[in-house]
Amino acid sequence: DFLKATTKSLLDSDLKDNQYISAKGKRVVIIGGGDTGNDCVGTSIRHGAASVTQLEMMPKAPDTRAENNPWPEWPKVCKTDYGQEEAIAVFGHDPRIYQTTVKEFLKDKNGNLCGLVTVKLESKKDEKTGRMMMAEVPGSEQKMDADLVLIAAGFLGTENYIANAFGVDLN
């Protein structure tokens, strides 16, 4: 809703219709480290956010390719995209906090969002499945101020209606 409404308002009225969620003057926290999260970082900065923090549950990727990740495989490296670059230019630091998730949203006496409680995460092996998973680090909870929280996580993929309309088989 945040990105779509901002784009529609920008195209329809150069943001003069106020038909979007404004980040102006707000302490913005974005949950999600992917492309949509990056777009939320950049858009929040252009709105005039007081601060922008981006939470990523996974560890920071390495700065250079590992030997087991050769070309032409997709590079599994840390990517600093335009939104993070804008945050560095405006606020003087990378907005990302890695291996962190939200445990609780905090509200003031009027019921308005005023912050959240985060917790650090670490990789652990699930004893039942043998798979690696992220688990909370006990005692690592921290409070963070926030006036606006944007959830930018869980991309499910594209819609199939165009492929279906043309009889294209997907795999």
Regions found by a protein language model. Give the residues of each.
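Residues forming the flavin
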Residues: D1-N171
